[in-house]
Design a protein with these regions (language model features):
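Nucleotide-state-sensitive switch-loop elements of NTP-binding domains
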Residues: 1-105
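Conserved strand-to-helix beginnings and helix N-cap segments that scaffold or border functional pockets
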Residues: 13, 44-47, 127-131, 288
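Residue-level signature of catalytic and energy-coupling elements of molecular machines
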Residues: 16, 36, 65, 114, ...
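Residue-level preference for the first positions of well-ordered beta-strands
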Residues: 31-34, 116, 274
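Cofactor-binding loop segments of dinucleotide-utilizing enzymes, especially the Rossmann-like FAD-
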Residues: 70, 151, 280
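C-terminal accessory "lid"/substrate-recognition subdomains
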Residues: 86-263, 284, 293-294
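Long protein-protein interaction modules used by eukaryotic assembly/scaffold proteins
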Residues: 273, 277, 281-297
Length: 297
């Protein structure tokens, strides 16, 4: 399947989907489809077409996003955008950026969208440097699982690169690291967690209204002042007083909320709800105030 510039993006998504459908019709079902992008690809442009495309729903689903990080050079990529100048300039023009302030590099986008992050070439850095890299990555994406390797060798594929089921459910363990709050180690992208009480039925609709507003309209509900923001990933786990547990997943402006399976086994029909946001400007206090005002808390 030849791809222009080595990647699939929004401008050719119909071609990419049709090519995979045609391949499966000719060769039958595959156990797994691993789509490898170039080093300058934006996962946010690719993931939604596999995650929510109804035409592929019966045979293909998005299992997860894996990002490979160069331990030796990733900080340089995040801080100065080395090798990413053209994409950075395009983003600045699209957002009418004046050239000042933190850079939004492709490295930021690839880390912020990931479900698993593999830090490679760890043999080329010291323990202190590796810790700095790990903390910087964690500040950008507090939800992703992080694994360190040398020469891209991972101990096993299943559960780390394959069979992630990253969009099937959201557990307390998934949100554990992010629940400590947001970090300011990276000036561009942050992970922020909002906690709130168990919802009643009426508040469930209000919660959905809040999600639609921040993702589709890129604004906050009510009259809460805010600075411009950009949400890359969203995960939520919301217990409801009637015993249900709702899980929410989002990539860019697309999201879905489903009822968790096996709630009785999980034993978590009650308790604290959590909403985790990853993106640009998501660490402002206005998000929490807007959600609480919308829910009437």
């Amino acid at each position: 399947m030849p791809l222009a510039n080595g990647c699939i993006c929004c401008s050719v998504k119909d071609v990419g989907v049709a090519a995979i459908e045609n391949l499966m019709e000719q060769s039958g079902l595959f156990d797994y489809i691993l789509l490898e992008t170039t080093g300058l690809a934006d996962p946010g442009n690719i993931a939604p077409m596999f995650w929510l495309d109804d035409g592929l729903g019966s045979s293909i689903f998005l299992d997860g996003i894996v990002t490979l990080v160069d331990a030796k050079n990733v900080l340089k990529s995040l801080d100065s955008g080395v090798g990413d100048e053209e994409n950075i300039e395009k983003r600045r023009q699209a957002q009418d950026h004046d050239g000042h302030g933190p850079l939004l590099t492709t490295a930021h986008l690839q880390i912020s969208h990931a479900d698993v992050i593999i830090i490679n070439k760890t043999d080329l850095v010291s323990e202190a440097e590796l810790e700095e890299v790990t903390q910087r990555i964690r500040s950008i994406n507090g939800l992703a699982r992080i694994k360190t390797t040398t020469k891209s060798q991972v101990p096993q594929l299943e559960g780390l690169v394959l069979d992630l089921h990253a969009y099937d459910q959201v557990t307390d363990a998934d949100l554990q690291f992010a629940s400590k709050g947001h970090s300011h180690l990276d000036p561009t992208i942050a992970t922020s967690t909002i906690t709130f009480p168990t919802l009643n039925r009426e508040q469930v609709d209000k919660f959905d209204f809040f999600l639609r507003t921040i993702l589709w309209e890129e604004t906050l509900t009510g009259h809460v002042p805010f600075k411009p923001f950009e949400i890359h990933r969203l995960k939520g786990r919301v217990p409801v007083k009637d015993g249900r547990v709702l899980i929410t997943q989002g990539v860019r402006n697309l999201y879905e909320t489903n009822e968790m399976e096996d709630v009785a086994k999980d034993g978590s029909g009650n308790g604290e709800a959590k909403l985790v946001l990853i993106g640009k400007g998501v660490d402002q206090e206005g998000f929490r105030k807007s959600l609480y005002d919308t829910l009437g808390l």
